[in-house]
Amino acid sequence: MIERGKFRSLTLINWNGFFARTFDLDELVTTLSGGNGAGKSTTMAAFVTALIPDLTLLHFRNTTEAGATSGSRDKGLHGKLKAGVCYSMLDTINSRHQRVVVGVRLQQVAGRDRKVDIKPFAIQGLPMSVQPTQLVTETLNERQARVLPLNELKDKLEAMEGVQFKQFNSITDYHSLMFDLGIIARRLRSASDRSKFYRLIEASLYGGISSAITRSLRDYLLPENSGVRKAFQDMEAALRENRMTLEAIRVTQSDRDLFKHLISEATNYVAADYMRHANERRVHLDKALEFRRELHTSRQQLAAEQYKHVDMARELAEHNGAEGDLEADYQAASDHLNLVQTALRQQEKIERYEADLDELQIRLEEQNEVVAEAIERQEENEARAEAAELEVDELKSQLADYQQALDVQQTRAIQYNQAIAALNRAKELCHLPDLTADSAAEWLETFQAKELEATEKMLSLEQKMSMAQTAHSQFEQAYQLVVAINGPLARNEAWDVARELLREGVDQRHLAEQVQPLRMRLSELEQRLREQQEAERLLADFCKRQGKNFDIDELEALHQELEARIASLSDSVSNAREERMALRQEQEQLQSRIQSLMQRAPVWLAAQNSLNQLSEQCGEEFTSSQDVTEYLQQLLEREREAIVERDEVGARKNAVDEEIERLSQPGGSEDQRLNALAERFGGVLLSEIYDDVSLEDAPYFSALYGPSRHAIVVPDLSQVTEHLEGLTDCPEDLYLIEGDPQSFDDSVFSVDELEKAVVVKIADRQWRYSRFPEVPLFGRAARESRIESLHAEREVLSERFATLSFDVQKTQRLHQAFSRFIGSHLAVAFESDPEAEIRQLNSRRVELERALSNHENDNQQQRIQFEQAKEGVTALNRILPRLNLLADDSLADRVDEIRERLDEAQEAARFVQQFGNQLAKLEPIVSVLQSDPEQFEQLKEDYAYSQQMQRDARQQAFALTEVVQRRAHFSYSDSAEMLSGNSDLNEKLRERLEQAEAERTRAREALRGHAAQLSQYNQVLASLKSSYDTKKELLNDLQRELQDIGVRADSGAEERARIRRDELHAQLSNNRSRRNQLEKALTFCEAEMDNLTRKLRKLERDYFEMREQVVTAKAGWCAVMRMVKDNGVERRLHRRELAYLSADDLRSMSDKALGALRLAVADNEHLRDVLRMSEDPKRPERKIQFFVAVYQHLRERIRQDIIRTDDPVEAIEQMEIELSRLTEELTSREQKLAISSRSVANIIRKTIQREQNRIRMLNQGLQNVSFGQVNSVRLNVNVRETHAMLLDVLSEQHEQHQDLFNSNRLTFSEALAKLYQRLNPQIDMGQRTPQTIGEELLDYRNYLEMEVEVNRGSDGWLRAESGALSTGEAIGTGMSILVMVVQSWEDESRRLRGKDISPCRLLFLDEAARLDARSIATLFELCERLQMQLIIAAPENISPEKGTTYKLVRKVFQNTEHVHVVGLRGFAPQLPETLPGSDEAPSQAS
């Protein structure tokens, strides 16, 4: 037998009055005896705190404060502790003989709230020899000890081998450990469970009948049937899920068209835009390529035009240059003509001026003679005037000498003055400022020598002058002629120059005679040279146009070659026209074929899409229509096989469901009629009695009872006889066994157990041999095991059935798809690929276009070559007649030679014309130049100069002679003052002086008159000279101008200049005509270039815009493609058949779909916003986002338990396959899941009956309990009338209320609540929902009413109420109820705890003095019978006979309180035996 766990001791550390006290607890009753305030309640509070460390529940009050809500005077738990670390520990030993110490560490928290900190812990594996006080205290000396903190306690225990210390952060974990180790009777999972446990302990502690427990006895005594509730909840959850699934199916069925519509329109909306963008991208690429080709072609054309323009511009520049040259030549020729004409006029003027000059020359010579005579007369007058002047001077001198003679002093003064005057005059004339009277003699000799030299030179010059006077006139005439011809020169060079000029004049006359023949020869050669230059220009132009230089010898052969080429090119051009027509015809045929293929391509693509879908669905490749028809036959055969297998699996699944339903019957009855018969007979099914048989014992009992394992056990068979008469609604074999259902055993049979079998001796002559069944069904455990295996098998079968059903419907749909394909697409599906042929034709078309382009280029080149050949022939026709001129290389040299000779002859003619007369005059007198006399004028000047020098020297010598002669007079300085007076001589001299002065005046007047006449002669001479010089200068200017003109003014010069001018005018006109043609062609070319440039610029702009658009679209398209590929929707969007629609058709298709989508997503805010964002034409990726959002939305709407795919399109296809099958299966499942109302009533009744039997068993244990007048205590359990009526209606009249239970809108709980309201309309349900009420009605405890009754004296059985009982009777009754609750908890928790553990039982009773001795004895008997421990507190007058008693006395020692404890074990006549460890331990700590 399993021993019950016990509490060994209670240890208090640092409590109020208890420093370190351990109370050993008795196995039955431990009594705490002592006066008021001795510490009994503190000890019990420490026990309760260690048992339930929940501060929200702990509330300690004295019994004298009954009804009070506030704490006691010692402040509850806070007041029972001392400062510092406190402990309360329980030392227990469980059924496994494991010592477990559980407890709490308590510590007061400072503050006004007076809180307490609690930390629960547990110690396992502690040796028996170690006392709890040794763990938590440390002895300091003999009189002092210290309480260890929790961390030190932990370290101390971890150091001990085999000891485990656990600290708990939650009370739930703490109680869980206590429950698992058998310390408490019930698992306290929640705060509600802890509250019930605390209320139980509190009721036990304070005694009496607790209203909190009696009001909720059902919660304390009746276990919660969680299995039944969970079964109902699972059933309802399954039904709810089933119904939700059915509703989802119905919603899906209703949404299927919406799904189809949404997917179809979304696909049309996005795919049309997707394909439109793809088409536009291809079109843009084609346009970009076309623009690039056109751009390349235009650039080539522009380059050709530019080359042409450059050529024409170069030719135009040449013509412009030539025109400038021609204009210059023409202007030069015109100017030359004008110059010739001017020269002729100038020559006439020159001849006229030369005649005038000859006349002026004669007049000038005559006037020179008149002037010479006037000059001679002028010289005579000057001599006479000079003589008169000298006479006046002489007279003045004589007048001065005469005065000197008048008086010596005067004379000396005069002499002195004259000497000074002579000295000053000598200084001035001799230019000797330092001259003195003393040095005058020396200077006189010098100046006399100079006078002599000057006189000799003057005489020599006078002789020379007389000799040169005769030759001067002829030499001057010849010299002037030489100067006129040659220009200024030295006189000594005149003879040589004159001879050279005469010889040159002869040569120049000979050259001048050759001018006319040379001019005619030059004109002829210049004409030939111009023709040669024109031929060279034509040849150079021809070579430039041909791009090659040709020799003159090659031109005739080239002319023939070009004519042959012209003929050949003419044939090629005609042949090219025919070839071009053939190519264009083939191109048109290709275009027509491509159009027909493009019309057929969408039909073929649709057939291929359908064929690909069929191939994907069936995993086969079809190459011909025969493959399709053969596979269709295979599909039909497979469909038949799948239907047969599905039906077989469905039959097996139904059989399993039936077996599960049969085994799931309550009580283990496989026949519902047995339950009704058992209730009718007042018996119990045998299977229900053995419902708790373990799985190991089930085969034995199943074989033991054999066919009678479904028997009904009745108390009395005789009472059943009357019910058997007329009984028809029963199994074929009905077994009835007489026995007490509460104490039934298997002793009714004589059994011999064999190996896996039994032999049952039914009678002496009848045995039954039964083998143990392989699958036993006897007992709940066996049935549950079987049901579990059946459920597993059913899951496999259901999955297989679902798979087969899906395969069947999939096969059927595949058959329908094949049928549609055969009817619609079989005719075109296996034809050749039109797109491949289109690609081939397009490549051929590109080749044809390239060939046409090349052909056009070749033809253009041939035309250009043809035109070039024609131009070359034309040019050669102009060049060939002039080949002889081109071959004449010396023509230019001869022209230059003749031109040089002509220039020389013309120069000679101009020389003869200009200087011929002067040479003729010079020739007879040239000999006078041989002896060139000195220059007459120079000689005259030298003579006059020598005269002046001789005169000056004579005057200087005279002045110095006078100074020398008057050297003595310088000493008469004193006599200068003595001069005065006049004399008569002086007067006479004065008169003569006046006459001389008059004569001088007349001479001067005559000189002045003759000078005026000379001036007139000179003026006439000057006028003639001026006229002659002017004429001479004009003549020189005219000759110089004629020389500057540089033309020969002969008689034929004007005619030649006019002919030359006319020729150049003709060339200039031709050049201007060609230039105008070139300018027009150049203007046209420039216009063409401008057009090409504008076109090129437009093409470049269009190309770059298109390229930028392509690049931009490419980036967006890449994002679109990336998004498409990432989301796997390319197959849905890339619909190739749409590629053949126009952009307008696709845009119209997209717009129509957009309108439909706006209506479809009007109620979906997310899709509506995404759709609105997708309407931006610049953001095509947003349409993909919308398509993905639609797919995601549809994926979220897809029930994955119905349709196993993420693709909404496939989901719709699978949906149609699954919906009908699931609807049928779920409807059947709902019927099977839905438990019948009768079954519910039977389950509740059976549960109520079982609990009533259990309460009856509990009552048997309280029959002998008596307290005072109370003789017995019992629990009365009754079914409430309203609930009993509900059970009757559920079992008997459920057909009348099927509207509730068959409603798909109500769960079973709600239907049950509605039925309860319908049966009890007078009851107010308040604010509770039907679901809540229904769940309460599924709990059997709500069907029962429980009350405690006591058998008191003569009153009999009365309801136990505190007012009807004495205090002791109430305490005893309450304790009886608590014992019943604890026992009920143990029974309830037995299946949750290990089978080898029996939990501790312990209750409290404070203030037990209110019980009499008989009641105390009753408690002791109750504790002994129930193996329960009891801690009671009583005053000192209580003396229990059994158990352990502790005497507690509170003492005060040196202001310190401590409790003195003495422990006694039992009462007897002998002296009480002192328990070990009863001595008072010191209560003080250091």
Swiss-Prot record:
GO terms of molecular function? ATP binding; DNA binding
In terms of SUPFAM superfamilies, this protein maps to: P-loop containing nucleoside triphosphate hydrolases
**Coiled-coil region list:** 326-418, 444-480, 509-603, 835-923, 977-1115, 1209-1266
Q: Which UniProt keywords apply?
A: ATP-binding, Cell cycle, Cell division, Chromosome partition, Coiled coil, Cytoplasm, DNA condensation, DNA-binding, Nucleotide-binding
**Chain segments carrying region Flexible hinge:** 666-783
Q: Name one GO cellular component term.
A: nucleoid
Classify the source by domain of life.
Bacteria
List the InterPro entries.
MukB, MukB/SMC, MukB_hinge, MukB_hinge_sf, MukB_N_dom, P-loop_NTPase
Q: Where is the major localization of this protein?
A: cytoplasm
Q: Which positions does UniProt annotate for ATP binding?
A: 34-41
The protein's location, in the record's own words, is: Cytoplasm, Nucleoid
A Pfam family this chain is assigned to: MukB_hinge
Q: How does it assemble?
A: Homodimerization via its hinge domain. Binds to DNA via its C-terminal region. Interacts, and probably forms a ternary complex, with MukE and MukF via its C-terminal region. The complex formation is stimulated by calcium or magnesium. Interacts with tubulin-related protein FtsZ.
User: What domain comment accompanies this record?
Assistant: The hinge domain, which separates the large intramolecular coiled coil regions, allows the homodimerization, forming a V-shaped homodimer.
Which NCBIfam families does the entry link to?
PRK04863.1
Family under the similarity heading: Belongs to the SMC family. MukB subfamily.
PANTHER family this protein is in? Answer: CHROMOSOME PARTITION PROTEIN MUKB, DUF4476 DOMAIN-CONTAINING PROTEIN
- The entry's protein name is Chromosome partition protein MukB
Name the source organism.
Escherichia coli O157:H7
Supply the gene name: mukB
